[in-house]
Amino acid sequence: MGNECFLTFTTTHLSEAEQKLALYRLQLVEPPKLPLEKKTNPDKDGPDIKPNLWMWVNPNMVYPPGKLEVAVKEEDQSALSAFQPALKEEEDSCSEASEVQQPLPPCRQKRKQRRSTVPLPLAPGRRAPLENPWRLPQAISPEGRLWSRPPLHYFHLIALALRNSPPCGLSVQQIYSFTREHFPFFRTAPEAWKNTVRHNLSFRDSFEKVPASRQGGASTGPRSCLWKLTEEGHRRFSKEARTLASTQLQSIQQCMSQPGVKPFLFDL
């Protein structure tokens, strides 16, 4: 490394073979001893020390600032500037084309639409409005007819069953049977809707549980019980049923197996 300081030029720009040759020649020349010996200058027009050749090199002339890159010709610069806008337009068109979604097959479109129409669960203590703005899911009956889910909350389905039942009340299984009888959608729907019915029965202000034996009904087990609609439940259902729009009533009627009994069930 120290011997390279005594070269008259740099070798980094040379090929590997020429660099080795320059180092070989350098080994044959003994570098001067430091400090440099003073020699008498007969002309007396300069220093008495013979400096190294690198001391006479101006680094700004060898590697001027900003001149390490090859200058681009004017015609090359014009061609490059004309190419860049075309490249930008091509990138923009590619990005716009990537944003366009490919059409999905019909089966995947129906599946995606069904997932997007599932209503979110309500927070504890909150009641769902009677109106359902989402598109209703549908189910196919064994007869081949397509039944839509009624635009009603589970509270209203349970209240319909209890309002149109004997005063003694109904069991959970009887509530299931009433719902499947009047709304065929639940005949082929997944069994998870039954869990939702049992969950809504826990609303103490709308429903009450009474032992079956106290009402004189037939007991099927030691823990059998019946469910009844409380006064608060009657008041809430009547209030919300009166606020139904005509379009909602038509949708409910289309979801019923016997559309003619709708006025009697809702007491309209």
From Swiss-Prot:
CDD domains xrefs: FH_FOXR
Record's GO cellular component terms: cytoplasm; nucleus; perinuclear region of cytoplasm
GO biological process: brain development; positive regulation of transcription by RNA polymerase II; regulation of transcription by RNA polymerase II
Keywords: Activator, Cytoplasm, DNA-binding, Nucleus, Repressor, Transcription, Transcription regulation
DNA-binding region in chain numbering: 149-248
InterPro entries: Fork_head_dom, FOX_transcription_regulators, WH-like_DNA-bd_sf, WH_DNA-bd_sf
Tissue occurrence: Expressed in adult germ cells (at protein level). Expressed in heart, liver, lung and embryonic brain.
Pfam families linked: Forkhead
Matching SMART domains: FH
Entry's Gene Ontology molecular function annotations: DNA-binding transcription activator activity, RNA polymerase II-specific; DNA-binding transcription repressor activity, RNA polymerase II-specific; sequence-specific DNA binding
Subcellular location per the Swiss-Prot or TrEMBL entry: Nucleus; Cytoplasm; Cytoplasm, Perinuclear region
Highest taxon in the source lineage: Eukaryota
Consequences of knocking out this gene: Reduced survival with the majority of mutants dying during embryonic development and only 23.5% of mutants living to postnatal day 21. Surviving newborns are smaller and lighter than their wild-type littermates. Newborn brains display decreased cortical thickness and enlarged ventricles.
Main location: nucleus
Segments of this protein annotated with the region Disordered: 91-126
Function: Transcription factor which acts as both an activator and a repressor. Activates transcription of a number of genes including the heat shock chaperones HSPA1A and HSPA6 and the antioxidant NADPH-dependent reductase DHRS2 which are involved in protection against oxidative stress. Required for normal brain development.
Protein name: Forkhead box protein R1
Originating species: Mus musculus (Mouse)
Upper taxonomic lineage: Eukaryota, Metazoa, Chordata, Craniata, Vertebrata
